Structure formats: structure tokens, C-alpha cells
């Protein structure tokens, strides 16, 4: 907020600094700021001032709680109320985890503020959102992991997020709206702001998240990335049993990294749900992967593209999942299957894949890309570097077969493979074994046999001499 206000005011007065104003003076601009940004923070409550006063503030926890309460209170009765309501519900400044006594908690909070203040993030408005955004999202993933959740459910690496966004955009320079039914921290949605610029996502960002803590973190993430409250629509709830964006569909771009093979309430009544009835079968109770896939297909516009990170088991598992794959293949909506390298995601080392869906395919072919070797090792993790992402993206766009890397298969060929969509069924693996020269091998064997014969004759000769 400080940067936003200073940027405007310094056009008139280059020395203006919102952080140095009195709360009474700043109050005059409160109504306008709430209308523009969705909330109001007086100068005394800004992070820089809270940090400066922290060492001498014996009731820092009370001060911080009051700041959070006042920010939320400032939005009451305004259009931004729903996007600010409960935003800080999970921030427990009086938690015993911070210390057993009031004094210990205040000391720990002071150290936390000082640690954040000391981070070399720079002015993220000048350097771009990546540094600040990545740091925030990584911290969220760490929080989720320590809370006993899979980091992959909360944090999709930036390089994977970018690839998904660019696949759905397919060189478009603008888009209507984007949707993620399992939005986690919002990192996938925010990639569209990075790739296109926020002004080129005309109707905004739509998402749903079942975990309350992560839902709040996602909304904070939107505000921190300077997405206006009027442009993001993040809902809390179970996407499969209680979808919140029915009235907002269809979407031109859908991206998601749903939880892998999670349990869900596959009530038999859902068979008649518009999202699932085409397959005439529901995804297994212990593996909701393809339920999310069918949900996204239902919400996709006729000219749109969905790019979904999937657990590879959905490509080959049998029974209900095989029937759902059969439905997807016969409906001719599977545009591409991309096998990714293993160990890409935070909190898991499994190899994943990307399933790309389209309703307006030009023919009945599906492109299979084996990108399992497209990575660079960095520390303990594998990374999709810019060259890897570009190779995958261009291969997807050009749709030309490349030996040992990608192949096209029509519906008939996929049917011959019993609707198995595993990439290695269609992309021939390169034989990396050393070629054997049979002629040279036979010559070598002959030489060995001759040598053995000579040695045997010599041994027999020695024995005869000894016997004599």
C-alpha cells in the first residue's frame, strides 16, 4: 500500500512518504483507499513502523492482533468485504508455539519481524513479482509441510506453473478469465498475471480451495501480488461436492495441480451430475484424480484449454478409471499427454504428467511427449530450466513427431492399447545399450579358443615330460 500511495503522491511532492504521516492526516484518504485497494492501513500500522517500534513494544502481540483486526474491519460493508473477511484468522500471535510466557512470545515475534525486515527482497515492484512471490510461496509450502500436509498440494514450482499457463495460452496475448479448482496458494493463477500482465486477464482469477488455512494464504498471496480485490474470486469449500463457480463458467483457461489420489465422497447421486454423467461412472472413492479432471472438462469453454498435473496412475489404472479414460478418448478431448521428470515438486519425488484437454481439436490425434529427461539437477531437486520448458512448449505447439521424444496417436491406436494413455506406450524408448559388433566378437572368441588349445597342448607336453 505504501508504494501505491507514494507513487501517486510523489508526482506532486517527490519527498512524500506515507509511512511518516500521522494517522489523523492519513485518515482523510481512508475512504478512497478502501475503494481502490479494498482495505486501509494507517501509517502507524505499516510493517516498517511496526518493525521499528518492535524492540521497545512490550505488547507487540496485542499490537499486531489489533492491526490485523483493523485491516479486516476497514473492509466491512464495502465491495471488498468477502475478499478480506477472515484473512488473518490463522495468524495466532498469542500461540504457545511462540513461547510459554507473554515475554517469550513478544521476543519471538520481534525476531520474526526483524528476520522478514532483513530479507534481501528489494523493491519487488521494480524487480518483478518473482523474488517476493517465490519467497512467500516457498514459505507457505514449508508451513504446509510442517503442518503435516503434502507440500505439492500447496506449492507448484514456478517453472511448472509457467509451463502450464503457456500451454493453455498457446501464444495468446490476452485471456478472458482463468480457473483453478484446487488453487492452493494461488501460484498457478498468478502465472497468468506474470506471463500476460494483469490488465490482459480481463475478467480475473477464479479458484476454490478446501483447506481453510490455504484458502486464506491464497487470498493474501493475491493482495501481495497487487491483484485488485475486484479481480480475484477465491472460494472456500470442496470443489467436487460443493462447487462454488457454477455461475462463472465456462473458462477459457483452466490450470490445476489437484491432490494426488485423494479420497472423495463419490455419492452415487453424483452420477447424474452434469460434470460426471458423460462417463456414466464415478472415479474411485480412494482416487479422486479423474473426478477433478471431469469437473474441469465440464467448466472448460468450447475454445478453451485445460492443463492439469496428474499422478501417472490415472493414465493406466483399470476399472472405473479405465472407463473414464475411454469416455475422454471417445469424446476426443485429450489433446496431449506429457510425461514430466521425477522429483520436480516440493514434498514429493514422484514423477508426474500433464494432461491437456481441448473441446475444439482439429483432428482425432493425441500428442504424447516424453519429457522425463528434460531437467537439470539442482541440489536434491530436479528443475525444468527455460530451455526444457521451451522445448516442451514448442513440441506441443508444432505437433510434429520426433523419434524417441514425441508421437501422435489417433483414437483407433489408443483403442488398440485399451485406452492406456501411458506415454511409453506411444513414444519408443531410445536404446542406450552399446551396439555389439558380432564379427569382431566372433573373431575374439576364435582367438581365445586358439589360445586355450595352445595352452592345453603345452600342458600335456609338460605332463609327458614329467612322466618320462
Regions from the PLM with identified roles:
Residues 1-163, 167-168, 230-239, 339-343, ...:
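Non-catalytic, mostly N-terminal accessory regions of nucleic-acid modification and defense proteins
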Residues 2-6, 121, 140-144, 197, ...:
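Non-catalytic alpha-helical coupling and interface elements of nucleotide-dependent molecular machines
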Residues 150-256, 261-263, 267-270, 275-279, ...:
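Conserved S-adenosyl-L-methionine
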